Amino acid sequence: MSLLTEVETYVLSIVPSGPLKAEIAQRLEDVFAGKNTDLEALMEWLKTRPILSPLTKGILGFVFTLTVPSERGLQRRRFVQNALNGNGDPNNMDKAVKLYRKLKREITFHGAKEVALSYSAGALASCMGLIYNRMGTVTTEVAFGLVCATCEQIADSQHRSHRQMETTTNPLIRHENRMVLASTTAKAMEQMAGSSEQAAEAMEVASQARQMVQAMRTIGTHPSSSAGLKDDLLENLQAYQKRMGVQMQRFK
């Protein structure tokens, strides 16, 4: 796996699923391929994106700044600086300085990532802030190692939280989660459907599913009534794809 592929993988792992994630993936691909060279426009676009947490925006801004060539005096962006200040915690800043000194001795991406993984996400973000604010310099490879370690720390905590939700025995939370998943699956089906005759069929199924979820929420239903909703939808989607000659069996 190439270095940039690895960076893209880690960064996208902390972006919530949805149309925005696809858009960010495209921007990252363009930046890494050298197709997008207007850093200012890119940062303005990033700043105004909804849904993303300030820290995720800060990390993306840091990656864009590392990758897109820019004039020496280009102004640093406040939204990135604020996100990478370790919540203003002096403890994070102390650790960030110690980490920075260690990173100065590293020359490889994997070496830097290994060193950085023993620090908390707050200290890692502060260290990125040091580099972003030009208070310290490391090679691009080492900076990318720091980025990936930070994303791994964040993705780990997100995964723990998702796992807690998936394994919860609370029937109301499970019910709501199934309805949310069914609704987002229906939305994805509508986006994929296109405009053929079979597409109308897929759109109809998706639309009915969304109406059903809406009705279930409006009148309040038994927590077990949502069981299998998403799977039924995915089966419909796969049947539609088969008719279109597309074989994708990996949605479940």
Swiss-Prot record:
Protein name: Matrix protein 1
Chain positions of motif Nuclear localization signal: 101-105
Miscellaneous section: Most abundant protein in virion. When expressed alone can form virus-like particles in transfected cells.
Originating species: Influenza A virus (strain A/Swine/Iowa/17672/1988 H1N1)
Quaternary structure (record): Homodimer and homomultimer. Interacts with NEP. Binds ribonucleocapsid by both interacting with genomic RNA and NP protein. May interact with HA and NA. Cannot bind NP without genomic RNA.
Pfam families in the record: Flu_M1, Flu_M1_C
Region of interest (RNP-binding), ranges: 165-252
GO terms classed as biological process: viral budding from plasma membrane
Gene transcribed to yield this protein: M
Membrane topology, from the record: Peripheral membrane protein
Primary location class: virion
Role description: Plays critical roles in virus replication, from virus entry and uncoating to assembly and budding of the virus particle. M1 binding to ribonucleocapsids (RNPs) in nucleus seems to inhibit viral transcription. Interaction of viral NEP with M1-RNP is thought to promote nuclear export of the complex, which is targeted to the virion assembly site at the apical plasma membrane in polarized epithelial cells. Interactions with NA and HA may bring M1, a non-raft-associated protein, into lipid rafts. Forms a continuous shell on the inner side of the lipid bilayer in virion, where it binds the RNP. Determines the virion's shape: spherical or filamentous. Clinical isolates of influenza are characterized by the presence of significant proportion of filamentous virions, whereas after multiple passage on eggs or cell culture, virions have only spherical morphology. Filamentous virions are thought to be important to infect neighboring cells, and spherical virions more suited to spread through aerosol between hosts organisms.
Family: Belongs to the influenza viruses Matrix protein M1 family.
GO cellular component, one term: virion membrane
Compartment list: Virion membrane; Host nucleus
Keyword field contains Nucleus: no
Alphabetically ordered keywords of this record: Host nucleus, Membrane, RNA-binding, Viral matrix protein, Virion
Top-rank taxon: Viruses
Region (Membrane-binding): 1-164
Any GO MF annotation of the entry: RNA binding
